[in-house]
Design a protein with these regions (language model features):
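Glycan-recognition and catalytic cores of secretory/periplasmic carbohydrate-active enzymes
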Residues: 1-122
């Protein structure tokens, strides 16, 4: 038996977009804690039930998406989320040479800790 194909309609496309927007805003992927406020989490460890680190690159994708959604919808919540992510990046990860720290460690036992001193320069 073959897989049933989902017919793409305007209705289910709109619903999928709404669900994706709700997830990005309500999932907790963007930090609300004082220490990491505005940053976007990277990998979630289901065994430890916590995020391992904050990845600067993902923050860049996130704030770009938030600006796009703001421009499309004029919903100021998207702009507010983008600004909080940008402020966190600049304050916590930007280096004097203009680059950004690769990641910020949350779980000190993460296997990704070796990247904490690397810098993105793009």
């Amino acid at each position: 038996m073959g897989k049933k194909k989902l017919a793409l309609t305007k209705k289910n496309l709109k619903q999928s977009i709404i669900e994706a927007e709700n997830w990005i805003l309500l999932s907790g992927i963007q930090n609300s804690s004082k220490k990491y406020f505005g940053s976007v989490n990277a990998w979630y460890d289901p065994k430890k039930k916590k995020y391992s680190f904050i990845y600067s690159e993902i923050n860049g994708y996130f704030l770009t998406l938030m600006v796009y959604l703001y421009k499309r919808s004029k919903n100021k919540l998207y702009l507010k989320r983008a600004i909080s992510s940008a402020k966190w990046l600049i304050k916590n990860t930007q280096k004097k040479n203009g680059g950004f720290s690769c990641l910020t460690v949350i779980d000190k036992h993460s296997s990704h800790n070796f990247k904490k001193d690397l810098i993105y320069s793009f």
